[in-house]
Amino acid sequence: MNPLIFIMLILTIILGTSIILTSTHWFMIWLGFEMNMMAMIPVLMKKYSPRAAEAATKYFLTQATASMILMLALIINLMYSGQWTIMNMTNNMASLLITIALTMKLGLAPFHFWVPEVTQGVSLQAGLILLTWQKIAPLAVMYQIFASINPNLLLTMALLSIMIGGWGGLNQTQLRKIMAYSSIAHMGWMTAIMIYNPNLMLLNLLLYILMTTSMFMMFMYNSTTTTLSLSLTWNKTPLMTVLMMTTLLSLGGLPPLTGFMPKWMIIHELTKNNSVILPTSMAILALINLFFYMRLTYSTSLTMFPTINNMKMKWQFQNTHHTTLLAPLITLSTLILPLTPMFILMT
């Protein structure tokens, strides 16, 4: 793909998300989603292969279906309210359809089936955009209309997403699929707290993007896509292998790393609102996620698979990826738990 065309597509994706973030008119929000989808499809197929074409087709069909449901909901809402403003949600059927459309775009269970398949079929760069930037727009719309969403429906989807995100990642050997199931579980945590404290959802989203970006950048640096190739990284970059281990544990939510902060704050907020069964269930299901992160950590850092070459790579095979952003990203992904009291006061 021509680099200029690729830059134009990325700018279109950013523009589509920006339109959604700044609009209070439903038609402009729908238009932003369409711009985002149409620009994302060529990005998914940047490195053309039959698998990438299949992934792009699955992405298009899912997103187009969600957009169709969203437009149907907007027309129903217009019939009953006579307005296009985002704050004026008066019809329960329209609210239900909008929730279904947004959760499809977000990849929440039970509409999660496209996320692992699409992520596995594309490059690491496209997978990073899909699992981070593309989550911002649906969550931003849900943030604005959370008062109109059925809380029982959203909490059921959230709990189901945490459960499926944990179970789905247990038997995976492909790193992109593992990160996709991790994304489903994290989206479940975010939507669970949205009804009680939407600002906490934004903090959770920020930390999730930081940790996921750190992991994908380390995967790209080492050109690893499977657990087997990940287990051989100690031979090339021993320091980065240790950093990868801590970032993985942070994604799993193990204290005293950054990833423990959002889980701690969400459980604290839920118990403060007299909810006991929900945070207990979420904490138990989070252990499944932590288990497959621990398994990845074990195969990455605590085992040394037999290899013929125990020396560093030859100069002509040295990796040329830039690592300027990795240091601050890894630091933020692992070491900002002490700032938790400040964030609790802010939210």
From Swiss-Prot:
Location(s) in or outside the cell: Mitochondrion inner membrane
Positions of transmembrane segments: 1-21, 25-45, 59-79, 96-116, 122-142, 145-165, 178-198, 200-220, 242-262, 274-294, 325-345
Membrane protein topology class: Multi-pass membrane protein
One Pfam family per UniProt: Proton_antipo_M
GO cellular component labels: mitochondrial inner membrane
EC number: 7.1.1.2
Keywords tagged on the record: Electron transport, Membrane, Mitochondrion, Mitochondrion inner membrane, NAD, Respiratory chain, Translocase, Transmembrane, Transmembrane helix, Transport, Ubiquinone
Coiled coil: none
Reactions the enzyme catalyzes: a ubiquinone + NADH + 5 H(+)(in) = a ubiquinol + NAD(+) + 4 H(+)(out)
Gene Ontology MF term list: NADH dehydrogenase (ubiquinone) activity
Any one GO biological process: mitochondrial respiratory chain complex I assembly
Principal cellular location given in the protein's record: mitochondrion
Similarity comment: family membership: Belongs to the complex I subunit 2 family.
Function text: Core subunit of the mitochondrial membrane respiratory chain NADH dehydrogenase (Complex I) which catalyzes electron transfer from NADH through the respiratory chain, using ubiquinone as an electron acceptor. Essential for the catalytic activity and assembly of complex I.
Self-association state and partner proteins as the record states: Core subunit of respiratory chain NADH dehydrogenase (Complex I) which is composed of 45 different subunits. Interacts with TMEM242.
Protein known as: NADH-ubiquinone oxidoreductase chain 2
Organism name: Myosorex kihaulei
Upper classification of the organism: Eukaryota, Metazoa, Chordata, Craniata, Vertebrata
